[in-house]
């Protein structure tokens, strides 16, 4: 029996992870974020009411459920408290009492944001598509061993010493490399002094609590952010995020052993989208792509940026299945494909040397040269929106799902037919 489930995005993010985590959370004893920051939003719809979460795990709407932010997450204190305030205003109960933050979480502070935005502005046409929220610089500090972490909020005198040293490093870059204004220590301390009293009580040994819950037989749900094809190591580098987005990162990012990760659920959109720069072999530039974007409301929930849309890329998904060890797939937004007369599935790529491959190459330079090889399938006119029974799906929709399974080599466990948590078809429950 699977006891703990890891949910990851299997494409370039925006696959619909939030809804599925919220849905699975009904059976969990805890939900854990293990990587990323507040650079992407997870959208939940319950009873027609929309909630967008950026840092807080998507299980927070279940009012008796503990939620955890593991050490693999970089935390903006201001963004976190803003999110808590939004949930409080919406009537969600005891958010601060149920939210636990690892003391080892690196903090995102004003100088991270300043450098992130200054760098992106300096890149000109070479922009990598950063959200400008300080995620990358915060991860740099972690690796360079100069990060200010959540635990430092408990020791303001030592924190100030660390801050002075960090700002000396940052301000040289801001002033002399990017011709930007320096960040003042007093301004950063003002932010810290404002947020510390509220965040300090939430700081908890997350690793210990999770291991105790597991020992006591409670089911845990690990919630990934972004998508596997944005992974810092295996994504389309350098057009990637700054963290490891793979299922394996749940172990290090939450502080649990890999033997605790029983089932990996890959969230997969029924077509493909990407935000920002980077190669995208199946991207559509015609009315079909426009239609997918309009019907799928393909705009970032945090940034508002339009998402690029394209055909389903099974070759890219095969790479994701391989590097994540995906146990089962959840296909989301199947209803967006309603009415598409003819559907293409990318099953491989032609390479510049005349060869072929059935799996996404590594790195953006190699992917940019790939020409998609398509299989064509008939679409369906019937509506799949809100369908909750697999047998009620149109025959061509079922054939589409079956072909995805065959080409990718992983089973479809769940099908999402709408944004609400109830608009879900279950073929195999990950916790079963």
Swiss-Prot record:
Entry cofactors: Mg(2+)
Sites where the protein binds Mg(2+): 14, 41
Annotated PROSITE patterns: ADENYLOSUCCIN_SYN_1, ADENYLOSUCCIN_SYN_2
Active site per database record: 14, 42
Pfam families: Adenylsucc_synt
Transmembrane segments: none
Keywords for the protein's UniProt record, in alphabetical order: Cytoplasm, GTP-binding, Ligase, Magnesium, Metal-binding, Nucleotide-binding, Purine biosynthesis
NCBIfam families: PRK01117.1, purA
Name used for this protein in its record: Adenylosuccinate synthetase
Gene name per UniProt: purA
């Amino acid at each position: 029996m699977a006891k703990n489930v890891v949910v990851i995005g299997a494409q370039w993010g925006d696959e619909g992870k939030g809804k599925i985590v919220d849905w699975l959370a009904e059976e969990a004893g805890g939900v854990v974020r293990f990587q990323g920051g507040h650079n992407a939003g997870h959208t939940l719809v319950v009873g027609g009411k929309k909630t967008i979460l950026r840092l807080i795990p998507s299980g927070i709407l279940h009012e008796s459920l503990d939620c955890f932010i593991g050490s693999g997450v970089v935390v903006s204190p201001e963004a976190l408290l803003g999110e808590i305030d939004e949930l409080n205003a919406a009537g969600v109960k005891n958010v601060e009492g149920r939210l636990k933050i690892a003391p080892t979480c690196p903090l995102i502070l004003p100088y991270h944001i300043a450098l992130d935005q200054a760098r992106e502005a300096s890149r000109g046409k070479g922009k990598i598509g950063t959200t400008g929220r300080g995620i990358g610089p915060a991860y740099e500090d972690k690796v360079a061993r100069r990060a200010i972490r959540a635990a430092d909020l408990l020791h303001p005198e030592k924190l100030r010493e660390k801050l002075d040293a960090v700002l000396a490093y940052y301000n040289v870059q801001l002033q002399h490399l990017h011709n930007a204004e320096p960040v003042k220590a007093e301004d950063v301390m003002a932010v810290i002094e404002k947020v510390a009293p509220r965040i300090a009580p939430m700081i908890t040994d997350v690793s210990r609590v999770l291991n105790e819950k597991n020992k006591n037989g409670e089911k845990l749900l690990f919630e990934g952010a972004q998508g596997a094809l944005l992974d810092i190591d295996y994504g389309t580098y350098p057009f990637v995020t700054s963290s490891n987005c793979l299922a394996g990162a749940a172990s290090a990012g939450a502080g649990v052993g890999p033997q605790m990760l029983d089932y990996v659920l890959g969230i997969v959109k029924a077509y493909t989208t990407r935000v920002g720069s980077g190669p995208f072999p199946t991207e559509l530039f015609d009315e079909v792509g426009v239609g997918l974007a309009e019907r799928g409301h393909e705009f970032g929930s945090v940034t508002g940026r339009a998402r690029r849309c394209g055909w389903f890329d099974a070759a890219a998904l095969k790479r994701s299945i391989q590097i994540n060890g995906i146990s089962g797939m959840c296909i989301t937004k199947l209803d967006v494909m309603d009415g598409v007369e003819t559907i293409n599935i990318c099953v491989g790529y032609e390479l510049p040397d005349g060869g072929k491959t059935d799996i996404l190459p590594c790195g953006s330079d190699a992917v940019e040269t790939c020409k998609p090889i398509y299989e064509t399938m008939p679409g369906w006119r019937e509506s799949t929106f809100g369908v909750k029974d697999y047998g009620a799906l149109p025959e061509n929709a079922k054939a589409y799902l079956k072909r995805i399974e065959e080409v990718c080599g992983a089973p479809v466990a769940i099908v999402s037919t709408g944004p609400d948590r109830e608009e879900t078809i279950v073929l195999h429950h990950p916790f079963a």
